[in-house]
């Protein structure tokens, strides 16, 4: 079953003399899509890439001084029990405490087609495959590289299976980059501590 993200970008309401008065300015549902790389990196949800997350555990919703006036709070309540892992992160934390240069061995098994020049051509990746036995899955997850011939109708192909490598920079899709750019613009206007991303997930 897939997992999706919902939530809002919030800023401290003008005039910013009261740090407790936040207002919702961007509904992220309309902007970003499902991206397990970003879910895992920021909030440790569906972290199949094995990134070191900015937040290891959900923080819950922020404490709203006036929850009845908060679009974010009311929308999260509307989701009820279908929502889980509520959390939030300030733009400052996003910028300073996220390791954007990570390159790690992921939990994804990748398969490659050997080429005549000795290189491997990437063909795809998965968590589980009917083409591999349970024992082979286990061996690969323990770091072993397996070469196997797979039959396709009357033909066959040789593939190499091994754990893949994940790079944070490769996981940032254009929609998520747009979100980060918008948060950066807001932070320049109202301050890095006065911009935050509030989210929850559903399966």
Regions found by a protein language model. Give the residues of each.
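Acidic (Asp/Glu-rich) sequence patches and key acidic residues
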Residues: 1-192, 202-203
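Conserved GNAT acetyl-CoA-binding A-motif
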Residues: 194-198
């Amino acid at each position: 079953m897939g997992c999706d993200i919902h939530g809002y970008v919030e800023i401290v309401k003008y005039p910013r003399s009261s740090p407790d008065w936040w207002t919702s300015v961007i509904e992220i549902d309309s902007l970003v899509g499902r991206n397990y790389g970003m879910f895992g990196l920021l909030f440790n949800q569906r972290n199949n890439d094995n990134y070191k997350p900015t937040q290891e555990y959900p923080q819950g919703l922020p404490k709203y001084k006036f929850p009845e006036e908060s679009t974010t709070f009311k929308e999260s309540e509307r989701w009820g029990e279908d929502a889980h892992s509520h959390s939030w992160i300030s733009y400052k934390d996003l910028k300073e405490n996220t390791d954007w240069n990570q390159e790690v061995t992921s939990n994804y098994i990748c398969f490659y087609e050997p080429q005549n020049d000795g290189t491997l051509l990437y063909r795809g990746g998965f968590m589980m495959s009917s083409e591999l036995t349970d024992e082979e899955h286990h061996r690969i997850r323990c770091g072993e590289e397996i070469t196997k011939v797979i039959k396709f109708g009357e033909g066959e192909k040789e593939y190499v299976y091994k754990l893949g490598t994940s790079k944070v920079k490769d996981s940032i899709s254009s929609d998520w980059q747009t979100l980060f750019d918008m948060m950066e613009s807001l932070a320049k206007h109202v301050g890095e501590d006065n911009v935050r991303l509030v989210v929850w997930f559903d399966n």
